[in-house]
Amino acid sequence: MEYLLPIHILAGTIALLAAAFAICSEKGKKIHITAGKTYYWGMVCIFLTALPMSIITSNVFLFLIAFFSFYLAFAGRRFAQNRKGIAAIVDWIAVGLMIAAGLGMWVLAVFYSIENNSQYITLTVFGFIAIALGYTDYKTYKQQEATGKKRIARHLTNMLAGTIAVVTAVLVVNVDIEPQWLPWILPTVILVPVISWWNWKVMK
């Protein structure tokens, strides 16, 4: 744990800075692509450190959040790379794990609710998002629609959602707000409308 946590924090910082560069740079240009790759590998490092930390501490909440957050970066990168819109086996596996993580969050939310742990609200919301995004990507793959503007929109949605996950982690660690679930949900409430607007702009 003493080595994993500093690496985890460093990776989160790198991912957040890289995401900012990717968002602010011109799409398709070298800076955007380099920043996007840096963001992705930062998310990989976050995932690979979060998993053992969650297992060591028996933290099912963190375990599920790790899969949820990494899927967003993974799917975002896959949509950027796959211009033909034909899903590979790894894409189907990833979608299945994302939906399973969402269902797992709902199950854990029930237990948290019984225990009067207010984080059941976070799990309920994130579970819905995981299932919704996973199912949307599943339909996109099945119908082979991930080409042209639709591909860019799916890339945008997943990458920005992953960025929300990183922003959320920073907020949760550094800001003490009550109730406990509020810092987990607040970035999503504020930034999801931005994603929706950006998608509309891409698709019109």
Feature locations, PLM:
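Alpha-helical membrane insertion/targeting regions
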Residues: 1-204
